[in-house]
Every structure is written in C-alpha cells, then in structure tokens.
C-alpha cells in the first residue's frame, strides 16, 4: 500500500529512468562570430539558480532554419547544465514554461523532452531534490570543468506519482516558491 500524502492519495510512486520517459539532446555550439546577433538562445547563466527559464534575458546567436527546428524549445522541455566549473552547478535544471519560437540552447546544456506527460510544475522541482541531485553529481566527470553526459541523464532514476498527485505537489511547491520570492522582495 502507498504512503499517505497530499489529498489523501495512497498510490505507489513508479520508478522510471529519465531516458525511458523522454528524449535528450545536447545543445548547439556557437562560434565567436555567430554571437551577439541573430536568434535568442538559452545559456548556462539563464539556468543557474532558476528552475524556470525567463525568456527576457537571453543572448543572441546565428542559427540556420534547420538548427531552429533541431534545437527548438517547447513548453515543458527541461534544460540541464551539462558543464559547470563547480560540481553543484552540473545537472541544474530549468523548465521551459512556454514555447520559445526561434530560440535555441547552448552546447553546455542538454534538453529533455518529456514523452510521459509529467506535470510542468512537478518538473520544476523534481530535478532539484537531493536524491536526484546526488545521482547526477556522483556521475560527473572531472576535467577543467565538471561534466555530465546524456547517458548519465538517461540512466537517472526517480519516482513519479500519479498525474493528480504531480499536479498537487507541483502547485504546492510553486506556491511556496512564490511566497519565498514575495518575502525576499519585502526585505529589499
């Protein structure tokens, strides 16, 4: 029998590998000449410390029509940091909250495209829990930076509740996140 949680739900959570419930794709690399003009793209700095991408502070780089399709960002996609100077930064994740037309993402990131139907608010928080973060960080390789590969993320295991419980959990943590943000603004 499942553990009692939100809404008196008693369903067991199912364990899944990330690679079994969606697809992963590394981002694109840009030359120096391609930077500063063209189309919007999401970079590392847009993810660190954020669980949702704010599309108002994006950089620009050239991209072909094919790249705009291959490296597109759709509502519900999650971007993971592939390479970071600090171990704590590798594997940080942020949700794409809406379709970002004509927007790509950096080669320092990996896109997860959900095929399972996870709740978007649930996705904002599930990849930040200690169990998931520890799995990712324990698999990071060491060079000049800490790195993870697609295969590390494909093999990432985590538990998923039924859709209604995902919705309730996601809503709860979104409201808590908003309350914390409001409290921080009041202190400024």
Where in the sequence are the language-model features?
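Short beta-strand/loop turn elements enriched in aromatics
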Residues: 33-52
